[in-house]
């Protein structure tokens, strides 16, 4: 059957209608010719009884021995170290200070007894009977002047009151070195050491510092200065000598 459509419809509209009609026709065709399969009836199930076979006993499980843990080894005893003995450094004993020399006692003046002066004998007048050749009598010497008294001179020069001995250098004592130092110095009116000089030292640069340090503390009697005083200081392992 054909439709007489007016010619005024455009081609796109016709094409769209044709496509929709084809789709609807295809769906109708498929629904009519579809075969619906019916499920087949259930078949009986045959069951055959079978006698069970002799069951074998299950294999014996191995006996698991308990694991014995080894005893822990005893820890080694820590032996405490013996305390170290303290090293005692024996310092050299200070040498005794020299005792001040005792002051000399002033000597007592001993007065000598005065001699008696006898008057000289007057000469006799010459006798006319005496021989003129006779020698004139000698007169005794005049002893009018008294005998000279002994004079006591006061000691002169510096007099030490305190002389500190120099300390023995530790290095020289360790090496058992002995030596000698000769010095020259002045003594001031207040009894102190001035112008200290080292004249010689054997061995050199070993004992000089100790000598200077000790002599700065020396004291002399005040009011008795001196210049150019020389002295020798001997360092011996058994002691220090000051000459």
From Swiss-Prot:
Keyword Repeat attributed: yes
Bilayer topology term: Single-pass membrane protein
Subcellular location: Cell inner membrane
Record's keyword terms, sorted: Cell inner membrane, Cell membrane, Membrane, Protein transport, Repeat, Signal-anchor, Transmembrane, Transmembrane helix, Transport
Similarity-based family: Belongs to the TonB family.
GO cellular component, one term: outer membrane-bounded periplasmic space
Pfam families: TonB_C, TonB_N
Name of the protein in its database record: Protein TonB
Main subcellular localisation: membrane
Region (Disordered): 53-163
Organism: Klebsiella pneumoniae
Residue stretches of each Sequence repeat: 69-70, 71-72, 73-74, 75-76, 77-78, 79-80, 81-82, 91-92, 93-94, 95-96, 97-98, 99-100, 101-102, 103-104, 105-106
Segments traversing the membrane: 13-30
Annotated PANTHER family: PROTEIN TONB, PROTEIN TONB-RELATED
Listed Basic and acidic residues bias regions: 82-96, 104-121
Function comment: Interacts with outer membrane receptor proteins that carry out high-affinity binding and energy dependent uptake into the periplasmic space of specific substrates. It could act to transduce energy from the cytoplasmic membrane to specific energy-requiring processes in the outer membrane, resulting in the release into the periplasm of ligands bound by these outer membrane proteins.
GO molecular function: energy transducer activity
Stretches with biased composition (Low complexity): 134-156
Residue ranges that the UniProt entry lists as topological domain Periplasmic: 31-243
GO biological process, one term: transmembrane transport
Domain (TonB C-terminal) ranges: 153-243
Assembly with partners or alone: Homodimer. Forms a complex with the accessory proteins ExbB and ExbD.
Chain ranges on the Cytoplasmic side, renumbered to this chain: 1-12
Gene that encodes the chain: tonB
Domain of life: Bacteria
Biased segments, Acidic residues type: 68-78
Chain residue ranges for the region called 8 X 2 AA approximate tandem repeats of K-P: 91-106
Location of region: 7 X 2 AA approximate tandem repeats of E-P: 69-82
